[in-house]
Amino acid sequence: MISTKDITGLILAGGRAQRMGGIDKGLIPFHGKPLIESAIAKLKPQVQTIVINANRSITKYATYGYAVIMDETPDFSGPLAGFSVGLKTCKTPYLLTSPCDSPLLPNNLAELLAAEMERGDFQLVYASSKEVDGKVWAQPVFCLMRSNLQDSLNQFLQKGDLKIDRWFKELRSSTVIFDDPQVFANVNTPEELKKLEEVSA
């Protein structure tokens, strides 16, 4: 059985945040505190330890007491670049990933993804959300993966491909559908930030 001590949490804070005017999203105030603090609070009970993937504000992120790792690829290459360095530093059998700007992520994210992982002996399990209209949307940056996937990911990245769903298709992967799409809401615009603060007040 996969337990908390088997999982390292990786918070992805390495993006450009172009739609937010280039502001470092993890440090944007949310209810008066940097967004990343909500991500840390949600992940901490679900994992053994946390690692933060960031490409700027390194000193600030380091004040939270966790290791801060930078992408090894240039020009803000996306979540797979963060996955890659996360796997490289992971010392537990599993890595759980989440972006820094989704403050409402499920308290049982690790538990449900781990149960599916064990059910089908998968290499990676990602979250999906059921929207109000009944459609199911993949939420691939919320995923639990085996920490021995670094070679697979490196080979994929060496082909010049950065599409997260295409890498998933090369693996034994599955998904868990969450009924509340709000738990994966993230911040891409000031309007979305305001809306998230309202629904989580």
What are these regions (language model features)?
Residues 2-161, 166-185, 190-192:
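Nucleotide and nucleotide-moiety/phosphate-recognizing core
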Residues 199-201:
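Hydrophobic helical membrane-anchoring modules
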